[in-house]
Each structure stands twice: as structure tokens, then as C-alpha cells.
Amino acid sequence: MSKILIIEDEAAIRRVLVKILSEENTNYKVSEAEDGLQGIELIKKEDFDLILCDIKMPKMDGIEVLMASKKIKPEIPIVMISGHGDLDTAVNAMRLGAFDYISKPPDLNRLLN
């Protein structure tokens, strides 16, 4: 079973992602964090196969989470999620080591594949 961490400050979006990825037929174990600091604490404690991380968050933004995560566990792929379909942000995230970048609302078919 693959373990996924969702780091998203918007509760409604986080709930939808958790629900979709936790369904019986997906074979994922999903953990969640409501901000970057909480996400980093989970990354330190657990091993994840994938991290889905929002970019615009209070306390610690997604780019900071990406950089910190790459220092702690560089092997975990991180997909950045943002409501701001900004190409510069996407390019910057990829340059810093993000595996991929998707816009909100995420394309569920793309997310599951």
C-alpha cells in the first residue's frame, strides 16, 4: 500500500483529496497536514511514497516545504498544487526538485495516474 501525504491549508480541498485517494479501490494510505510546519513534522516521523503540497499556505509555504523535505528525505517525490496557475511558480518548483505541478482544482484522472 502506497503512503501519500497531503499538505493543504484549505480544509475543503484537503477533504476532497483525502476522500478520493482513500477510497477502497485506490490502495493508498493517506495522511494529511493543514500547514507546512505540520507537514514537515510528519515527513520527519513517517516514510511516504508521495507528497501532494499546496504552494500558498500560511506559516510555511509550499516552496519552503519542498526545500526542507528535500533535505530531510530527498527520495520522496513531491507534486505541488496551486490555485495560481503561474508558469513561473511551476518552473521554480520543478527547478527546486518538485516531481510535478498541478493546478487547483486538480484533474482527478491525472492525479490518480
Positions of the model-derived regions?
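Conserved acidic carboxylate
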Residues: 8
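Two-component/phosphorelay signaling modules centered on CheY-like receiver
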Residues: 11-31
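Conserved phosphotransfer cores of two-component systems
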Residues: 24-25, 44-46, 68-75, 96
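Acidic catalytic/metal-coordinating carboxylates
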Residues: 35-38, 61-64
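Receiver (REC) domain active-site loop signature in two-component systems and cognate sites
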Residues: 55-57
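C-terminal output helix
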Residues: 86-88, 102-113
